Amino acid sequence: MLSSLRRLVNTKYLTPVRLSSLSQTPQKSENDVKLYILEYHYVKDATEKRQPYREEHLKLASKLAKANKIILAGATEQPPTGGVLIWRNTSVEEITEFVRKDPYVQNGVVTKWTIKPFLAVVGAKEFSNDLLKV
């Protein structure tokens, strides 16, 4: 699975990405992963460069939020240097498909991205089904 994901990363705008391996957490299997973090790194002056693609990017993310796949998403820092999207009820393949379709990625606003399993153990009661039992 991760080797196929690495092949998908090779686009003209993206630098090589270090993928977090699920095998780095041997006590947990992929089936235990309930949340993922998609992290984007943006080009310099991203505020201006993302503007022509922002509406379509937000539309794509909003569709997945309505489907309960993305639970939080937004830029990091001000002015933005990247973005974070927290996913649930999904797979690495589905997140990768989102990345491939994202106008920010297609148009060079994103310079690097990573998908990491998020092994949450504490959270609000609305997320109790997403937490790992320890």
Feature locations, PLM:
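Conserved, structured core segments of small domains
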Residues: 2, 13-134
